[in-house]
Amino acid sequence: MSTEGGPPPPPPRPPPAPLRRACSPAPGALQAALMSPPPAATLESTSSSSSSSSASCASSSSNSVSASAGACKSAASSGGAGAGSGGTKKATSGLRRPEKPPYSYIALIVMAIQSSPSKRLTLSEIYQFLQARFPFFRGAYQGWKNSVRHNLSLNECFIKLPKGLGRPGKGHYWTIDPASEFMFEEGSFRRRPRGFRRKCQALKPMYHRVVSGLGFGASLLPQGFDFQAPPSAPLGCHGQGGYGGLDMMPAGYDTGAGAPGHAHPHHLHHHHVPHMSPNPGSTYMASCPVPAGPAGVGAAAGGGGGGGDYGPDSSSSPVPSSPAMASAIECHSPYTSPAAHWSSPGASPYLKQPPALTPSSNPAASAGLHPSMSSYSLEQSYLHQNAREDLSVGLPRYQHHSTPVCDRKDFVLNFNGISSFHPSASGSYYHHHHQSVCQDIKPCVM
Protein backbone atom coordinates (compact mmCIF):
# COMPACT_ATOMS: atom_id res chain seq x y z
CA MET A 1 0.00 0.00 0.00
CA SER A 2 1.11 3.42 -0.87
CA THR A 3 0.08 4.66 2.36
CA GLU A 4 2.36 2.35 4.28
CA GLY A 5 5.40 3.07 2.04
CA GLY A 6 5.19 6.93 2.36
CA PRO A 7 6.74 9.18 5.01
CA PRO A 8 5.00 9.23 8.31
CA PRO A 9 2.99 12.34 9.28
CA PRO A 10 4.63 14.87 11.61
CA PRO A 11 3.70 14.64 15.23
CA PRO A 12 1.38 17.34 16.63
CA ARG A 13 3.06 20.34 18.25
CA PRO A 14 2.50 20.95 21.93
CA PRO A 15 0.42 24.02 22.87
CA PRO A 16 2.44 27.14 23.68
CA ALA A 17 3.06 27.85 27.28
CA PRO A 18 1.12 30.81 28.77
CA LEU A 19 2.94 34.09 28.87
CA ARG A 20 4.12 35.18 32.32
CA ARG A 21 5.53 38.42 33.56
CA ALA A 22 9.15 38.29 34.17
CA CYS A 23 8.89 40.74 36.97
CA SER A 24 6.29 38.84 38.92
CA PRO A 25 7.74 35.78 40.65
CA ALA A 26 5.96 32.52 40.69
CA PRO A 27 3.56 32.06 43.54
CA GLY A 28 5.47 29.17 44.95
CA ALA A 29 8.79 30.91 44.80
CA LEU A 30 7.41 33.88 46.59
CA GLN A 31 5.95 31.78 49.35
CA ALA A 32 9.20 29.86 49.67
CA ALA A 33 11.17 33.03 49.86
CA LEU A 34 8.94 34.31 52.58
CA MET A 35 9.09 31.14 54.61
CA SER A 36 12.82 30.60 54.30
CA PRO A 37 15.13 32.62 56.68
CA PRO A 38 17.00 35.49 54.99
CA PRO A 39 20.74 35.32 54.65
CA ALA A 40 23.06 37.21 57.04
CA ALA A 41 24.11 39.88 54.54
CA THR A 42 20.53 40.68 53.83
CA LEU A 43 19.79 40.96 57.55
CA GLU A 44 22.71 43.31 58.04
CA SER A 45 21.67 45.54 55.19
CA THR A 46 18.08 45.65 56.32
CA SER A 47 19.08 46.33 59.90
CA SER A 48 21.36 49.16 58.84
CA SER A 49 18.66 50.69 56.72
CA SER A 50 16.11 50.38 59.50
CA SER A 51 18.53 51.86 61.98
CA SER A 52 19.22 54.75 59.64
CA SER A 53 15.52 55.27 59.15
CA SER A 54 14.96 55.13 62.88
CA ALA A 55 17.81 57.55 63.35
CA SER A 56 16.26 59.85 60.83
CA CYS A 57 12.97 59.48 62.61
CA ALA A 58 14.65 60.24 65.89
CA SER A 59 16.36 63.26 64.43
CA SER A 60 13.14 64.49 62.91
CA SER A 61 11.32 63.95 66.15
CA SER A 62 14.04 65.77 68.03
CA ASN A 63 13.88 68.56 65.53
CA SER A 64 10.13 68.77 65.88
CA VAL A 65 10.41 68.72 69.64
CA SER A 66 12.99 71.47 69.57
CA ALA A 67 10.86 73.46 67.15
CA SER A 68 7.81 73.02 69.29
CA ALA A 69 9.81 73.98 72.34
CA GLY A 70 11.08 77.07 70.59
CA ALA A 71 7.58 77.94 69.51
CA CYS A 72 6.36 77.48 73.05
CA LYS A 73 9.18 79.63 74.35
CA SER A 74 8.43 82.34 71.82
CA ALA A 75 4.74 82.17 72.61
CA ALA A 76 5.49 82.36 76.29
CA SER A 77 7.81 85.28 75.78
CA SER A 78 5.25 87.08 73.63
CA GLY A 79 2.54 86.39 76.18
CA GLY A 80 4.73 87.75 78.91
CA ALA A 81 5.47 90.84 76.86
CA GLY A 82 1.76 91.33 76.19
CA ALA A 83 0.98 90.94 79.84
CA GLY A 84 3.69 93.44 80.68
CA SER A 85 2.39 95.95 78.15
CA GLY A 86 -1.15 95.48 79.44
CA GLY A 87 0.05 96.14 82.94
CA THR A 88 1.82 99.33 81.91
CA LYS A 89 -1.27 100.53 80.00
CA LYS A 90 -3.43 99.92 83.03
CA ALA A 91 -0.92 101.72 85.16
CA THR A 92 -0.88 104.71 82.84
CA SER A 93 -4.66 104.78 82.45
CA GLY A 94 -5.01 105.25 86.17
CA LEU A 95 -3.20 108.62 85.90
CA ARG A 96 -5.95 110.91 84.56
CA ARG A 97 -5.26 114.33 83.09
CA PRO A 98 -6.13 117.21 85.44
CA GLU A 99 -9.49 118.81 84.91
CA LYS A 100 -9.68 121.99 82.89
CA PRO A 101 -10.46 125.17 84.88
CA PRO A 102 -14.13 126.25 84.71
CA TYR A 103 -13.27 129.51 82.96
CA SER A 104 -13.03 130.59 79.38
CA TYR A 105 -9.66 131.43 77.89
CA ILE A 106 -10.65 135.09 77.86
CA ALA A 107 -11.22 134.99 81.60
CA LEU A 108 -7.95 133.15 82.19
CA ILE A 109 -6.00 135.74 80.19
CA VAL A 110 -7.73 138.55 82.06
CA MET A 111 -6.78 136.90 85.36
CA ALA A 112 -3.17 136.75 84.28
CA ILE A 113 -3.05 140.37 83.11
CA GLN A 114 -4.84 141.69 86.18
CA SER A 115 -2.40 139.87 88.43
CA SER A 116 0.44 141.97 87.04
CA PRO A 117 1.17 145.29 88.81
CA SER A 118 1.63 147.01 85.45
CA LYS A 119 -1.57 145.41 84.04
CA ARG A 120 0.30 144.08 81.04
CA LEU A 121 2.05 140.79 80.26
CA THR A 122 3.83 139.12 77.41
CA LEU A 123 2.65 135.83 75.96
CA SER A 124 5.30 133.80 77.80
CA GLU A 125 4.39 135.49 81.08
CA ILE A 126 0.74 134.58 80.53
CA TYR A 127 1.84 130.97 79.98
CA GLN A 128 3.83 131.02 83.20
CA PHE A 129 0.93 132.41 85.19
CA LEU A 130 -1.48 129.77 83.92
CA GLN A 131 0.97 126.93 84.56
CA ALA A 132 1.66 128.14 88.08
CA ARG A 133 -2.02 128.66 88.88
CA PHE A 134 -3.74 125.62 87.34
CA PRO A 135 -2.40 122.02 87.20
CA PHE A 136 -4.18 121.43 83.89
CA PHE A 137 -1.62 123.54 82.05
CA ARG A 138 1.34 121.67 83.55
CA GLY A 139 0.55 118.33 81.87
CA ALA A 140 1.68 116.84 78.60
CA TYR A 141 -1.13 118.52 76.68
CA GLN A 142 0.15 121.64 74.92
CA GLY A 143 -2.84 122.60 72.78
CA TRP A 144 -3.97 125.22 75.30
CA LYS A 145 -1.14 127.53 74.20
CA ASN A 146 -2.63 127.75 70.74
CA SER A 147 -5.99 128.61 72.31
CA VAL A 148 -4.40 131.40 74.34
CA ARG A 149 -2.76 132.89 71.26
CA HIS A 150 -6.00 132.60 69.31
CA ASN A 151 -8.02 134.47 71.95
CA LEU A 152 -5.38 137.15 72.38
CA SER A 153 -5.22 138.01 68.71
CA LEU A 154 -8.89 137.72 67.77
CA ASN A 155 -10.70 139.07 70.82
CA GLU A 156 -11.61 142.73 71.15
CA CYS A 157 -10.90 142.78 74.88
CA PHE A 158 -7.13 142.65 74.46
CA ILE A 159 -4.79 145.23 72.97
CA LYS A 160 -1.31 144.52 71.66
CA LEU A 161 1.00 147.27 72.86
CA PRO A 162 3.88 148.44 70.67
CA LYS A 163 7.23 147.13 71.71
CA GLY A 164 9.48 149.51 73.60
CA LEU A 165 12.75 150.58 72.05
CA GLY A 166 15.05 149.62 74.90
CA ARG A 167 13.12 146.60 76.18
CA PRO A 168 14.89 143.28 75.66
CA GLY A 169 13.08 140.23 74.34
CA LYS A 170 10.94 139.61 71.33
CA GLY A 171 7.42 139.42 72.77
CA HIS A 172 4.89 142.25 72.76
CA TYR A 173 2.95 143.29 75.81
CA TRP A 174 -0.75 142.54 75.99
CA THR A 175 -3.21 144.53 78.07
CA ILE A 176 -6.98 144.80 78.55
CA ASP A 177 -9.00 147.29 76.55
CA PRO A 178 -10.22 150.01 78.97
CA ALA A 179 -13.65 149.94 77.34
CA SER A 180 -13.98 146.25 78.25
CA GLU A 181 -12.85 146.38 81.86
CA PHE A 182 -16.41 146.77 83.14
CA MET A 183 -17.14 143.27 81.83
CA PHE A 184 -14.88 141.81 84.50
CA GLU A 185 -15.73 144.05 87.43
CA GLU A 186 -15.71 142.53 90.91
CA GLY A 187 -13.94 139.42 89.68
CA SER A 188 -16.79 138.31 87.46
CA PHE A 189 -15.32 136.03 84.81
CA ARG A 190 -18.48 134.45 83.49
CA ARG A 191 -18.93 133.91 79.80
CA ARG A 192 -20.56 136.75 77.88
CA PRO A 193 -22.58 136.30 74.68
CA ARG A 194 -21.13 137.41 71.38
CA GLY A 195 -21.32 141.16 70.86
CA PHE A 196 -21.95 141.88 74.54
CA ARG A 197 -19.40 144.68 74.74
CA ARG A 198 -20.70 146.45 71.64
CA LYS A 199 -24.26 146.38 72.97
CA CYS A 200 -23.17 147.73 76.32
CA GLN A 201 -21.21 150.52 74.70
CA ALA A 202 -24.18 151.44 72.55
CA LEU A 203 -26.51 151.53 75.54
CA LYS A 204 -24.21 153.48 77.85
CA PRO A 205 -24.92 157.01 76.51
CA MET A 206 -28.64 156.41 76.39
CA TYR A 207 -28.60 154.99 79.90
CA HIS A 208 -26.75 157.97 81.33
CA ARG A 209 -28.96 160.40 79.46
CA VAL A 210 -32.17 158.80 80.66
CA VAL A 211 -30.98 158.39 84.24
CA SER A 212 -29.83 161.99 84.43
CA GLY A 213 -33.05 163.34 82.95
CA LEU A 214 -35.79 161.08 84.30
CA GLY A 215 -38.09 162.33 87.02
CA PHE A 216 -41.76 162.64 87.88
CA GLY A 217 -43.28 166.07 88.23
CA ALA A 218 -40.13 167.63 86.80
CA SER A 219 -38.27 167.75 83.54
CA LEU A 220 -37.96 164.23 82.17
CA LEU A 221 -35.38 164.63 79.47
CA PRO A 222 -32.30 166.83 79.14
CA GLN A 223 -32.26 169.93 76.99
CA GLY A 224 -30.66 168.42 73.91
CA PHE A 225 -32.60 165.17 73.95
CA ASP A 226 -34.79 164.85 70.88
CA PHE A 227 -37.77 162.74 71.78
CA GLN A 228 -40.09 161.63 69.02
CA ALA A 229 -42.53 158.91 69.93
CA PRO A 230 -44.04 156.38 67.54
CA PRO A 231 -47.72 156.72 66.61
CA SER A 232 -48.80 154.23 69.25
CA ALA A 233 -47.22 156.21 72.08
CA PRO A 234 -48.12 159.64 73.47
CA LEU A 235 -46.39 162.49 71.70
CA GLY A 236 -43.52 164.16 73.46
CA CYS A 237 -42.95 167.89 73.56
CA HIS A 238 -39.70 169.79 73.68
CA GLY A 239 -39.13 172.28 76.37
CA GLN A 240 -36.77 175.06 77.25
CA GLY A 241 -36.12 177.39 80.12
CA GLY A 242 -37.72 176.26 83.33
CA TYR A 243 -39.47 173.23 81.88
CA GLY A 244 -36.76 171.34 80.01
CA GLY A 245 -38.96 168.49 78.84
CA LEU A 246 -42.15 166.55 79.34
CA ASP A 247 -44.46 166.83 82.31
CA MET A 248 -45.82 163.47 83.39
CA MET A 249 -48.83 164.51 85.49
CA PRO A 250 -52.30 163.04 85.86
CA ALA A 251 -55.11 164.89 84.15
CA GLY A 252 -56.47 167.83 86.03
CA TYR A 253 -53.33 168.27 88.06
CA ASP A 254 -52.24 171.89 88.34
CA THR A 255 -48.50 172.23 88.13
CA GLY A 256 -48.67 175.43 90.05
CA ALA A 257 -48.05 179.00 89.14
CA GLY A 258 -44.60 179.16 90.65
CA ALA A 259 -42.78 177.18 88.02
CA PRO A 260 -39.30 178.56 87.29
CA GLY A 261 -39.08 180.92 84.38
CA HIS A 262 -42.55 182.48 84.76
CA ALA A 263 -42.48 186.23 85.13
CA HIS A 264 -46.18 186.58 85.98
CA PRO A 265 -47.31 183.47 87.83
CA HIS A 266 -50.83 184.79 88.46
CA HIS A 267 -51.52 184.94 84.72
CA LEU A 268 -50.54 181.35 84.03
CA HIS A 269 -52.63 178.23 84.48
CA HIS A 270 -51.88 174.67 83.51
CA HIS A 271 -54.54 172.12 82.80
CA HIS A 272 -54.45 168.75 81.13
CA VAL A 273 -56.86 167.05 78.81
CA PRO A 274 -58.01 163.61 79.93
CA HIS A 275 -57.31 160.54 77.86
CA MET A 276 -59.78 159.93 75.07
CA SER A 277 -60.98 156.46 75.87
CA PRO A 278 -64.29 154.61 75.83
CA ASN A 279 -64.26 154.19 79.60
CA PRO A 280 -64.02 157.38 81.67
CA GLY A 281 -61.80 155.70 84.27
CA SER A 282 -58.90 155.13 81.96
CA THR A 283 -55.45 156.57 82.44
CA TYR A 284 -54.53 160.07 81.37
CA MET A 285 -51.96 161.22 78.90
CA ALA A 286 -48.90 163.26 79.56
CA SER A 287 -49.32 166.81 78.36
CA CYS A 288 -47.40 169.97 77.81
CA PRO A 289 -48.16 172.99 79.98
CA VAL A 290 -49.01 176.16 78.06
CA PRO A 291 -49.29 179.55 79.77
CA ALA A 292 -52.66 181.23 79.55
CA GLY A 293 -54.37 184.58 79.79
CA PRO A 294 -57.76 185.19 81.36
CA ALA A 295 -59.76 184.64 78.19
CA GLY A 296 -58.11 181.48 76.91
CA VAL A 297 -57.14 180.21 73.52
CA GLY A 298 -58.80 177.37 71.62
CA ALA A 299 -55.54 175.81 70.47
CA ALA A 300 -56.64 172.21 70.73
CA ALA A 301 -59.33 170.36 68.90
CA GLY A 302 -62.56 171.75 70.26
CA GLY A 303 -60.79 173.77 72.95
CA GLY A 304 -63.08 176.40 74.48
CA GLY A 305 -62.42 179.70 76.19
CA GLY A 306 -63.23 180.81 79.70
CA GLY A 307 -63.15 177.32 81.12
CA GLY A 308 -66.02 176.07 78.99
CA ASP A 309 -65.60 172.72 77.31
CA TYR A 310 -67.17 172.27 73.97
CA GLY A 311 -66.91 170.26 70.80
CA PRO A 312 -68.95 169.53 67.71
CA ASP A 313 -72.62 170.30 67.95
CA SER A 314 -75.36 167.73 67.84
CA SER A 315 -75.80 168.12 64.10
CA SER A 316 -72.28 166.90 63.30
CA SER A 317 -71.04 163.34 62.99
CA PRO A 318 -70.40 161.27 66.12
CA VAL A 319 -67.07 161.45 67.90
CA PRO A 320 -65.12 158.27 67.41
CA SER A 321 -63.98 156.60 70.58
CA SER A 322 -60.87 155.11 69.04
CA PRO A 323 -57.89 155.03 71.44
CA ALA A 324 -55.63 156.09 68.59
CA MET A 325 -57.01 159.62 68.89
CA ALA A 326 -55.70 159.73 72.42
CA SER A 327 -52.12 159.94 71.24
CA ALA A 328 -52.87 162.68 68.73
CA ILE A 329 -54.08 165.56 70.89
CA GLU A 330 -51.48 165.94 73.56
CA CYS A 331 -49.74 169.30 73.21
CA HIS A 332 -52.91 171.25 73.80
CA SER A 333 -54.27 174.47 75.13
CA PRO A 334 -54.74 174.72 78.89
CA TYR A 335 -58.15 176.25 78.55
CA THR A 336 -60.02 173.03 78.12
CA SER A 337 -61.59 172.13 81.43
CA PRO A 338 -60.24 169.06 83.26
CA ALA A 339 -63.76 167.71 83.46
CA ALA A 340 -64.06 167.41 79.70
CA HIS A 341 -64.01 163.86 78.47
CA TRP A 342 -64.81 161.94 75.36
CA SER A 343 -68.06 160.08 75.57
CA SER A 344 -68.25 156.30 75.62
CA PRO A 345 -70.25 154.37 73.02
CA GLY A 346 -72.99 153.69 75.55
CA ALA A 347 -73.47 157.34 76.38
CA SER A 348 -74.28 160.26 74.12
CA PRO A 349 -71.81 160.25 71.21
CA TYR A 350 -71.49 164.02 71.12
CA LEU A 351 -69.56 166.53 73.11
CA LYS A 352 -71.13 169.37 75.00
CA GLN A 353 -71.74 172.58 73.10
CA PRO A 354 -70.82 175.77 74.95
CA PRO A 355 -73.83 177.99 75.52
CA ALA A 356 -72.12 181.11 74.13
CA LEU A 357 -70.82 179.46 71.00
CA THR A 358 -72.88 178.80 67.90
CA PRO A 359 -71.90 176.88 64.79
CA SER A 360 -72.06 180.07 62.77
CA SER A 361 -69.54 181.84 64.99
CA ASN A 362 -67.07 178.96 65.04
CA PRO A 363 -67.45 176.88 61.89
CA ALA A 364 -64.07 175.16 62.20
CA ALA A 365 -64.68 173.89 65.70
CA SER A 366 -68.28 172.88 65.04
CA ALA A 367 -67.42 170.56 62.18
CA GLY A 368 -67.60 166.86 63.00
CA LEU A 369 -64.69 164.51 63.43
CA HIS A 370 -64.12 162.01 60.70
CA PRO A 371 -65.27 158.62 61.98
CA SER A 372 -62.58 156.73 60.11
CA MET A 373 -59.69 158.62 61.71
CA SER A 374 -57.36 156.04 63.19
CA SER A 375 -53.96 157.68 63.50
CA TYR A 376 -52.04 160.84 63.02
CA SER A 377 -49.04 161.76 60.95
CA LEU A 378 -46.21 163.85 62.25
CA GLU A 379 -45.03 166.16 59.52
CA GLN A 380 -41.29 166.48 59.91
CA SER A 381 -41.11 169.45 57.59
CA TYR A 382 -43.18 171.52 60.01
CA LEU A 383 -41.28 170.64 63.16
CA HIS A 384 -39.32 173.48 64.68
CA GLN A 385 -36.35 171.62 66.07
CA ASN A 386 -33.97 174.53 66.42
CA ALA A 387 -36.16 177.58 66.81
CA ARG A 388 -37.64 177.88 70.28
CA GLU A 389 -40.49 180.31 69.87
CA ASP A 390 -42.56 181.73 72.64
CA LEU A 391 -46.29 181.56 72.25
CA SER A 392 -47.70 185.04 72.21
CA VAL A 393 -51.34 184.79 73.09
CA GLY A 394 -53.88 186.66 71.02
CA LEU A 395 -54.32 190.32 71.76
CA PRO A 396 -51.58 192.56 73.18
CA ARG A 397 -53.08 192.58 76.67
CA TYR A 398 -52.64 188.83 76.87
CA GLN A 399 -49.05 188.79 75.77
CA HIS A 400 -46.33 187.85 78.23
CA HIS A 401 -42.58 187.86 77.84
CA SER A 402 -40.09 184.98 77.75
CA THR A 403 -42.41 182.17 78.74
CA PRO A 404 -40.82 178.75 78.26
CA VAL A 405 -43.41 176.50 76.72
CA CYS A 406 -43.63 173.47 74.50
CA ASP A 407 -42.19 173.59 71.03
CA ARG A 408 -44.73 174.08 68.36
CA LYS A 409 -45.05 170.59 66.95
CA ASP A 410 -47.49 170.58 64.09
CA PHE A 411 -49.91 167.69 63.90
CA VAL A 412 -51.75 166.88 60.72
CA LEU A 413 -54.83 165.21 62.13
CA ASN A 414 -57.22 163.20 60.07
CA PHE A 415 -60.14 165.38 61.03
CA ASN A 416 -62.81 166.75 58.72
CA GLY A 417 -63.30 170.10 60.33
CA ILE A 418 -60.96 170.22 63.30
CA SER A 419 -58.08 172.52 62.66
CA SER A 420 -54.73 171.00 61.87
CA PHE A 421 -51.81 172.56 63.67
CA HIS A 422 -49.85 174.28 60.94
CA PRO A 423 -47.46 177.14 61.60
CA SER A 424 -47.82 180.48 59.97
CA ALA A 425 -45.52 183.43 59.54
CA SER A 426 -47.11 185.32 62.40
CA GLY A 427 -46.12 182.82 65.04
CA SER A 428 -48.97 183.89 67.34
CA TYR A 429 -52.11 182.09 68.38
CA TYR A 430 -55.22 184.23 68.50
CA HIS A 431 -58.49 183.66 70.20
CA HIS A 432 -60.41 181.14 68.21
CA HIS A 433 -63.85 182.68 68.44
CA HIS A 434 -65.64 185.91 69.31
CA GLN A 435 -64.01 189.02 67.87
CA SER A 436 -60.78 187.61 66.31
CA VAL A 437 -59.86 184.78 64.01
CA CYS A 438 -57.09 182.23 64.45
CA GLN A 439 -54.36 182.93 61.97
CA ASP A 440 -52.03 180.11 62.91
CA ILE A 441 -54.59 177.33 62.94
CA LYS A 442 -55.86 176.61 59.48
CA PRO A 443 -58.45 174.05 58.52
CA CYS A 444 -56.96 170.98 56.93
CA VAL A 445 -59.50 168.61 55.49
CA MET A 446 -57.85 165.22 54.89
Curated annotation (Swiss-Prot):
- Its recorded name reads Forkhead box protein F2
**Keywords in UniProt for this one?**
Activator, DNA-binding, Nucleus, Transcription, Transcription regulation
Pfam families for the chain: Forkhead (PF00250)
Q: Which GO terms describe its cellular component?
A: nuclear body; nucleus; transcription regulator complex
In which residue ranges is the amino acid composition biased (Pro residues)? Answer: 1-18
Q: Which GO terms describe its molecular function?
A: DNA binding; DNA-binding transcription activator activity, RNA polymerase II-specific; DNA-binding transcription factor activity; RNA polymerase II transcription regulatory region sequence-specific DNA binding; TFIIB-class transcription factor binding
Q: Which part of the chain engages DNA, per the record?
A: 100-194
Region: Disordered; residue ranges are: 1-97, 257-278, 304-325, 340-371
Q: Which gene encodes it?
A: Foxf2
Q: Tell me the tissue specificity.
A: Uniquely expressed in the bronchiolar epithelium and in type II pneumocytes.
- State where composition is biased (Low complexity): 45-78, 311-325
